[in-house]
Every structure is written in C-alpha cells, then in structure tokens.
Amino acid sequence: MMTSCNDCKKLNENVIQDEEKVYDPEKMLVRLSVIEVYPEYLDEYLAAAATVGGESVKKEPGVICIYPSHLKSDKNQIRILEIYRDQEAYQSHIASEHFQTYKQGTLHMVKNLELVDMTPLDPSAMPYIFKK
C-alpha cells in the first residue's frame, strides 16, 4: 500500500510506479458512466451504487476508483467515475459477484445508461490523487 505521495515515482512518460504497483496510463481504462435513474428508485439505487463502489475498490486490486455522485440540480442524474488498471481489471470487475449483484438488482431502476470512455489529461497526477 502506498504510504505517501512521496513514494510515487514517475519512471518515464508512460509508466507510473509506487512501491508496490506499476500503472501504465496507456493501458488504463477511465470511464464516466452517465446514468439516469427513475425517481421512485433513487434511494435504493444510490445505496446499491455506493455499496458496489466501495466493495470493488476494497476487494479488487485492479479497480483504482469507482466514485458515484449525482448532479446537484437533479439527483436522478448519476455520474460514476471509474478507473481500472487495464482492460483485464475491468473484465474481472464486471464478472465479480458483487458487480453482478448490483447490475442485476438495479436494471429496472435505470432509465438511461451511457458509458463514456475518457483519456486523462495528466495521468502522472493519478498517484497523488488515488492512493491505492
């Protein structure tokens, strides 16, 4: 586990390392899930999203971040920032029991879902933000 930001070292422009992990920004999967939830299921959905996010980060070494939030102006509009070490970590995540429980349990709650793949502007800053 990384103990401080001082443990992070930028090895070169493409690889970031802390004492135990190496992340290749070219392989990382960064995604924004854009979700609209039916109002009558909002509380139930928010609880499920918070649970699966926390479990995933704790249990899966390749899950760097799952950070659900909602728009201030419309709580039914959910955004989830997802960051995975690589495609393999993402595939492992979506096959996990806790993700499948979340997915199957919330399908009827979701009015609309869009998955937007992103490219980080400064991947070298990630070790300073996410200390996993």
Regions found by a protein language model. Give the residues of each.
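C-terminal motif of bacterial Sec signal peptides marking the signal peptidase cleavage site
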Residues: 2-4
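Glycine-rich beta-strand-turn "strand-cap" elements at beta-sheet edges
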Residues: 6-30, 69-74, 103-132
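Short, well-ordered beta-strand segments in beta-rich or mixed alpha/beta enzyme
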Residues: 28-36, 65-94, 132
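Short, surface-exposed ligand-recognition loops at beta-strand->loop->(often short) alpha-helix junctions
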Residues: 36-45
